[in-house]
Amino acid sequence: MAKEQVQAITKMEEDFAQWYTDIVKKAELVDYSSVKGCMILRPYGYALWENMQKVMDEKLKETGHENVYMPMFIPESLLQKEKDHVEGFAPEVAWVTHGGDEKLAERLCVRPTSETLFCEHFSKIVQSYNDLPKLYNQWCSVVRWEKTTRPFLRTTEFLWQEGHTIHETAEESQAETLNILNLYASFCEDYLAIPVIKGQKTEKEKFAGAKATYTIESLMHDGKALQTGTSHNFGTNFSEAFDIKFLDRNGKWQYVHQTSWGVSTRMIGGLIMVHSDNNGLVLPPKVAPVQVVIVPIAQHKEGVLAKATELQAHIQKVARVKIDASNKTPGWKFNEYEMKGIPIRLEVGPKDIEKNQVVLVRRDTKEKEFVPMDQLEERIPALLEEIHIALFNKAKAFRDENTYVATNFEEMKKIADEKQGFIKAMWCGELACEEKLKEEFGVSSRCMPFEQEHLAEECICCGKEAKQMVYWGKAY
């Protein structure tokens, strides 16, 4: 049975999309629901999200943000107040038209995002500069009626956090926007072991209604980019539309400066596609629901289960640990926990007990070592950190190996046709060139990185003077 289970995973080299689907199903992260595009987060998948949420929530509270909750319904008239915003989301909006059998006087939108609700609220509670800043965060689900869906990456309903803040000055709102982007980047790198590129979105790719959008981009196993998190500076675009004013220090009315930012369960899709392999899920230790699994060998023999339980009591002081004392074979268990991506497996049987040791196996490298039982409390935390570093370094090496430089149109064509990954190239800043590259090569601008490189004098597309180096790529 174990063999059949492993063989059920399609190899990523053969069909990456099917490989991904196999993993999310076989690792019991999600199940499909009866509503197209909606997923059921199973206990293991939800525990993974909870661990991510816990870290993020603590970091936001440490920086002065407060959690709130807004309604899930938005009146159509409220959504219409910011023109660019509503146009950007209109195709994805789900509408409620009836309450019971009664037709509603006004359609209600099921929130695709909550800017308009926060704006309405802010306009009621802010009068003076003494009321600023307001630093709010919301954990909720949102609905976007997507045409093509895939678990975690693009679903009709998904879980996320969305932050909304208002400030006295443009400088404060810009600082907030970039501070949050840095928080997201450090979370990805320090907890998910995913290396990211920080940068600004082009006008074409920025959030509907924003003055500027900043992003963290990561590279998946198949060479496609994933926008892992975004932070938006709205300037006064929304505050003018919603009349969010305050009396400044000179007694004059001013519009607030506003930000919005968010990350979602899409991050789980990212960590699957960055770290996992043809044997199943590989989880970064810091967010893994279970960090260590103990598999008793010949558990029917006297003393084996007792010793496994004793080890669990010691290890749970330093890691999230479970014992599998079920009557399934050790081979089945090995494959099961390999599939679920548990970072460390410990095997303990009669011979190990005699030698006062355990067999320790790493999920990421399959390396095996013998560890004295009295050293486990020390060895396990150190090894979990080693695994995190190894996963990060491996992902960064992959990204670097699959990042290419193009200095002219023909070079870009050759790379786009033959390779998968990021393409660094210069750009003049014109929308026409951005759209032509998308049309010709299927690549979009991922970001204008903060760390700029001067690769050439001319735009990759039109030959005019270049203004920015841009990361281009095919993306989810």
UniProtKB/Swiss-Prot annotation:
Record's subcellular location: Cytoplasm
GO terms (BP aspect): prolyl-tRNA aminoacylation
Gene3D superfamilies with a match to the protein in the record: Anticodon-binding domain (3.40.50.800), Bira Bifunctional Protein, Domain 2 (3.30.930.10), C-terminal domain of ProRS (3.30.110.30)
A GO MF label: proline-tRNA ligase activity
Record keywords: Aminoacyl-tRNA synthetase, ATP-binding, Cytoplasm, Ligase, Nucleotide-binding, Protein biosynthesis
Catalytic activity: tRNA(Pro) + L-proline + ATP = L-prolyl-tRNA(Pro) + AMP + diphosphate
Record family assignment: Belongs to the class-II aminoacyl-tRNA synthetase family. ProS type 3 subfamily.
Protein name: Proline--tRNA ligase 2
Gene behind this protein: proS2
